[in-house]
Each structure stands twice: as C-alpha cells, then as structure tokens.
C-alpha cells in the first residue's frame, strides 16, 4: 500500500477534470493544469469527487488521518508548534502505522509529518529545538513516537522547498538541496528497490508520503522547478484562475503560476513512483492512493486564507484509489472524510 498526500493540493487542480469521462461528473470546471501522470492514473482508479478534509488545516487533518479520530479526540485540534502544547498526537493512540505493523507490514514514512508538539529534542544538539525560530514549528520525531513506522525519513514542517531536511530512522539529519517532492520520490524508489536492505522483502509494505508542496510559499523559482513553471509563466492570469468566484485583483493572484507549477511537479514525482512500481512488477498487487490534507482557495471566496475554511476550494481534496482487478475504475461521489481512512 502506498498513500501519497501532498499538502494544500485542491481537488480542482487535476487535469483530468477537464477531460471526457470526468468533466460531466462534477459541478466545477477543473483548473487548467498539466498533470499527465494523474490523468493516466485516474483512468485506472476509483476517483472520489466529493472527498473532504473536514478540518482543512495541516496538523488536525494529519491527526485524523493517523488516528481515525476527530481533532477533539486525536490530540491535534490546531497546527502544532512550540506555543501549543495542547496540540500533539496522542502517545496512547493506536495509529494507522501501528495497525499495519501489527498486521505484518513493513511500514515506512517519508516527508512532512507535522503532528507533534515540538520539544527541545534535537538529536545532534540535546536540549535544543531543531530550529532557531520562535515559535518552533519543526520537530524531530523520536522512535517511541513513530507509531509503528519502522523506516523513517521525515521532519515536522519546514517550508523551504528547495532546501529541505529530514531525519532518518536512526536520527541522522540529511540536507539534500533538492526540491522536496522529487527528493522524497527518489527515497521511496530506493525503499521499493530495497537499496541497502532497508525493508523486509518477505513482508508487504505500507508507505506514507507526506509531500509539502504545493503548500506555500509559492512566489518564486525557489519554491518550484523551473521546467514546471515554464508551462505557466506566459499564461494570462485570467486563463489560469478560472473559477467564477475568483478575484483577480487580489495580490495573491500572481502566485497562481507558481502554485500550479508545484502541482505539476508533484504530479511528476508521483509519476516516478508509479513507473518504479511497474518496473519492479509491483503495480498489479499494490494499492496506491493519491490524496491531500486540504485544498487552496487561491483568490476565491474573497479570502486570503488558503485553507481552514468551509469552502470547497479548501475542503474538497483529491482521493484516487488504484487496485488493479479489485477496484473498478470509475468516478464516485462517496462523501469520504479523513477519519474514514483508518482501517
């Protein structure tokens, strides 16, 4: 099982919603984005058009996803930072990684977690936070808080997309100087190939990949890949932001090209994982899910807040499930939300 969930990726931002067989299944016009891998994946998947992030904010959604409980029970009612000790994943919760580990899976987590209260527990500098900023957002997750994930390559939250960092299973920090979704897809590929004997090949695997983009910032080439930005750089804003409730006069409108470039980059990273599954002969026997933690308003609804609102641009998220021979490809309007995902 592979569960890929980028951050701040709205349901409307997938190219197949503009294509035959899909556009008549929804009540919106899809964003004019380039997502060739997701377009092909959708034709092999069950696509849930009405999946919702019922608390469309990073940490609360992750708390629900990991525990199957609503924010008032998961321990994560707010975004986690060092000024909010009330918001941190419950240590006594049986989480999704615990469930799969007990069922005999080799469990791996890659990328953004953002579900723990940051404490001064830097492995390399005991007694200090892992970042100098106050309040501290980023966090190191020690082994006892990984909830069943035996392979670890993760961080709390950090928004320099071309300067990411990660802590591995043993607590060693890595600074790869690479756009984070592409770096993470590369690490997932290495795990699938079992480079360095990092997984037990006698066991099935459960992989979660928390990509940060297209989360903000999205204002320069420091935030996305140039080859993806080039697809949008000459497009008029009114040809990109096409929702009927959009306000093109908002300052944020200039960000649309970078946001959509990040969407395309995430699609490319996701495609690399799919290609590797096929090359390894694992594609027919692997459940692959593409989802998101919440959406992005992007100048709609007269709000500057990209998320944390009851609007469809914020709450309606991608949810595509592929399991060849088991799940019939189709579009379904099932009203699924985050706590439903827990087995």
Task: List the model feature ranges, each with a label.
Residues 1-343:
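Formylglycine-dependent sulfatase
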């Amino acid at each position: 099982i592979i569960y890929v969930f980028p951050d701040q990726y709205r349901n409307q931002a997938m190219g197949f919603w503009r294509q035959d067989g899909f556009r008549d299944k929804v009540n919106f016009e899809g964003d004019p984005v380039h997502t060739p891998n997701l377009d092909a994946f959708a034709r092999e998947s069950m696509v849930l058009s009405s999946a919702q992030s019922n608390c469309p904010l990073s940490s609360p959604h992750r708390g629900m996803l990991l525990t199957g409980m609503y924010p008032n029970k998961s321990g994560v009612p707010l975004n986690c930072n060092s000024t909010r000790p009330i918001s941190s994943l419950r240590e006594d919760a049986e989480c999704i990684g615990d469930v799969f580990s007990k069922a005999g899976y080799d469990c791996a987590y890659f990328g953004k977690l953002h579900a723990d209260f940051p404490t001064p527990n830097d492995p390399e500098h005991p007694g200090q936070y892992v970042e100098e900023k106050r309040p501290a957002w980023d966090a190191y997750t020690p082994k006892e808080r990984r909830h069943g994930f035996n392979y670890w390559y993760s961080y709390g939250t950090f928004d320099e997309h071309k300067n990411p960092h990660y802590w591995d299973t043993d607590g060693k920090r890595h600074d790869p100087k690479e756009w984070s979704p592409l770096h993470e897809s590369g690490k997932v590929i290495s795990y699938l190939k079992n480079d360095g004997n990092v997984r037990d090949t006698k066991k099935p695997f459960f992989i979660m990949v928390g990509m940060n983009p297209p989360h903000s910032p999205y204002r320069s080439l420091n935030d996305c890949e140039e080859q993806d930005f080039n697809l949008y750089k000459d497009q008029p804003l009114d040809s990109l932001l096409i929702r009927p409730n959009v306000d093109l006069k908002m300052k944020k409108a200039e960000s649309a090209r970078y946001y959509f470039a990040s969407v395309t980059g995430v699609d490319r990273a996701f495609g690399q994982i799919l290609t590797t599954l096929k090359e390894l002969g694992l594609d027919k026997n692997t459940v692959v899910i593409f989802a998101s933690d919440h959406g992005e308003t992007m100048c709609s609804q007269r709000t500057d807040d990209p998320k944390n609102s009851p609007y469809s641009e914020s709450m309606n998220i991608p949810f595509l499930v592929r399991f060849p021979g088991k799940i019939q490809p189709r579009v379904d309007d099932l009203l699924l939300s985050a706590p439903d995902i827990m087995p």
